Amino acid sequence: MSELKTISIRGAREHNLKGIDLDLPRNKLIVMTGLSGSGKSSLAFDTIYAEGQRRYVESLSAYARQFLEMMQKPDVDQIDGLSPAISIEQKTTSRNPRSTVGTVTEIYDYMRLLFARVGVPYSPATGLPIESQTVSQMVDRILAFEEGTRLYILAPIVRGRKGEYKKELAELMKKGFQRVKVDGQFYEIADVPALDKKYKHDIDVVVDRAVVRPDMAARLADSLETCLKLADGLAIAEFADKPLPPEDTAAGGSANKSLNETHERVLFSEKFACPVSGFTIPEIEPRLFSFNNPFGACPSCDGLGSQQKVDENLIVPEPARTLRDGAIAPWAKSSSPYYNQTLEALGKAFGFKLSSKWTDLSKEAQHAILQGTDDKIEFNYQDGARSYKTVKNFEGIVPNLERRWKETDSAWAREEIERYMSAAPCPACAGYRLKPEALAVKINKLHIGEVTQMSIRKARDWFEVLPENLNAKQNEIAVRILKEIRERLRFLNDVGLDYLSLSRNSGTLSGGESQRIRLASQIGSGLTGVLYVLDEPSIGLHQRDNARLLETLKHLRDIGNTVIVVEHDEDAILTADYVVDIGPAAGIHGGQVIAEGTPQDVMANPKSLTGKYLSGELGVAVPAERRKPKKGREIKVFGARGNNLQNVTAAVPLGVFTAVTGVSGGGKSTFLIETLYKSAARRVMGAREIPAEHDRIDGFEFIDKVIDIDQSPIGRTPRSNPATYTGAFTPIRDWFAGLPEAKARGYAPGRFSFNVKGGRCEACQGDGVIKIEMHFLPDVYVTCDVCHGKRYNRETLDVTFKGKSIADVLDMTVEEGVEFFAAVPAVRDKLQSLFDVGLGYIKVGQQANTLSGGEAQRVKLAKELSKRSTGRTLYILDEPTTGLHFHDVNKLLEMLHALVEQGNSVVVIEHNLEVIKTADWIIDIGPEGGTGGGEVVATGTPEDIVKVERSYTGHFLKELLDRRPAGKREAAE
């Protein structure tokens, strides 16, 4: 059979698609573009990917299927020519604190193998390589214990491994051994209970029981030799009379202890031990370097690298306040007189009053309040009618909160205390996450933790020259491992992530970064014959790195894959082999293929809006004149040092539209979000944000509100929707409750809520669907057969306005809602603001968890726009053009500039040059990412920036300003 040349789709009707018929070439780079909400994702993800994935999963056995997420069958007549599909979406990787860039890309797994096979252990005490111990050295060490010490000499034959071990125990009995220690208990071998093979076990053989005496060297040597033979070079001397406190054992919750570690013990190894300090490394194997395994994880922080500690700066966030005014944050909200009476007693002892500012207290007094007192103090308490006196040490706020945090079972109390805690690097492992034994193993003078903290760029150089520093035997072992590591580092470099470090927590990555990491992992896997579907991989990527990303996508295509990319980036569209433009507009007005073919075909098609923007017929105009910043009206940040910022001092002018630009990882978000926004939120809005390190910030007196409009979901449950979030649902319910029929029945607005009993359908509890769990198939959501998906009971649905019930209103698009409620300003204005941000196509009651990041951000923007402006608000947006077509960018810019016209200030972090060129002022941070960035490269108007040689942004902006004519801001029709 000849190989299929196309993916043929017939009758695709998922979501708003209007029965699309389409033939896509296989093994090509295909870009799907079109207005936001036109149906690109419905076609790429919900139809093509869903069907490719579903068919692959269906080919597996029923047993395997239960572990995989099954996709629903999309609404399509027929698809031919599909391959197994892999989707790489915009979701951030993992919120798990144990997940790092190294573990996600599997580079860390290869590094563990490398260190286990060619690493050399060094003694922390002497700094010299560790040699193996001889039996005589072990005997001398035991004889040095106090005479009369009772010991068990044990051979650890099983250490933290799963299994039943019946055969091994029977073998031991044959050899004449009688007792074993299993999971912390001693047993006669015949009496050992059956072990569950699903759990990890520890088994030590009791080789000898001895009391230390000078004349027993020969017997000890004999016993130790037996141990070393049994346990592959290991032996343990356990002190029979020195039990460990319960909290230091595995049973007491110490995750990184062997179950057999119930008493103090000394581990001997004929492999690795320091003769001076006796520091011993049990066995060098890959799991010793895993911070997710008890054998490698640092016992203090359980391999997290940081510990939650009460932070004194959060206890006293505003030191200029007086004690009575609430300088001590955890006590400020309480109405109980107890806290003030406690402070009065401390004041008598340390000479301060409640009217004193925190900064005026002596160091001794501050220490006493925060950390407690050694001396006893007299406290007088009066509680209504009761008064009493007590003399005691004062525990201190910090120890008190830490104790309560450890002891409490209440999640609420824990959360409350965590507001005053911050993560500090673990003092035991210095943030490297591993045991001292693992950090003692080095290659070329560095341990594994130091290598993971390098940037990917530096690590790549280090691994390149590593073979020169290894001997012939080490090189022979390492050659294949190094090849894998180098390749993966190269791919990360190719997708523009060379500024990240391998130890970076994956939860702190942006959506674009985590998508590109997964992309790098996919290239590393080297699969061919696969269908890849990607969602805007260029998000968060500077124009400079775009070419490298596109090369990566072309590489995926060249090795024999079909790559479908949903993308708005001009370079990506022009690089594609085949472009599909979906439109003509959003929502119900979209869902059709407007143009398809090569980029030139699309540009030549008069119907294609995308084509008009690509050919330059339409465009975002450069403003004829830019607003001039007023002298002195600015927020100035001094000495910002968070993450990679290098003592940055920069001013953000107010009353203008400012763009913060620069390459990925340069420090834009650290400067704008972590430093400026968090300080402003704290000072202006009283929020409990912890800003990144800086000296001071001036100019907050010019603003009365600061709002960060980000891309996080507007709600995580299906019950949250645009109407509830923007506040439109309240006037809608009030309106229905005011209708004559509702009044006659005595219905209040609560009757029209699907979240509370009364008006909602109780069969599905207002969800409209009922979830049925199917173990080998995807969970099935069936429409509720009582309310038929309407979410309300019949009585509530009897109340109608213009023939529509409340359920019909929730099912309207925003555009229909604006028309329907034209005579109800309270509802119309809120829906109009959603329509203005280009969301006319979403349903009024659309579930929040089905909105994309860009849509969620625009819903938030609409909510802010519908509020009455004070003209003194600072709006901060991080990449607002995510998911926006050129045409939508035009609309968005109109709205942002409208906010500025009202006297507000707008600051955006942006890579999109169409936005940057319309800015009044630019702050360019860089020049490189990571350690090569963190400086202000240039500030000024776009025309000023293009003259700065060091600015990458200026370089790309120059091409654009030279190419496009100036004019008024073009209205988006």
From Swiss-Prot:
Gene Ontology BP, a term: SOS response
One Gene Ontology molecular-function label: excinuclease ABC activity
Highest taxon of source: Bacteria
Residues annotated as binding ATP: 34-41, 662-669
Chief place of localization: cytoplasm
PROSITE patterns: ABC_TRANSPORTER_1, ABC_TRANSPORTER_2
NCBIfam families the UniProt entry points to: PRK00349.1, uvra
Function, in words: The UvrABC repair system catalyzes the recognition and processing of DNA lesions. UvrA is an ATPase and a DNA-binding protein. A damage recognition complex composed of 2 UvrA and 2 UvrB subunits scans DNA for abnormalities. When the presence of a lesion has been verified by UvrB, the UvrA molecules dissociate.
Family, as annotated: Belongs to the ABC transporter superfamily. UvrA family.
Protein name: UvrABC system protein A
Gene3D superfamilies associated with the record: ABC transporter ATPase domain-like, ABC transporter ATPase like domain, ATP-grasp fold, A domain, P-loop containing nucleotide triphosphate hydrolases
Subcellular localization, as worded in the UniProt entry: Cytoplasm
InterPro entries for this protein: ABC_transporter-like_ATP-bd, ABC_transporter-like_CS, ATP_grasp_subdomain_1, P-loop_NTPase, UvrA, UvrA_DNA-bd, UvrA_inter
SUPFAM superfamilies the UniProt entry points to: P-loop containing nucleoside triphosphate hydrolases
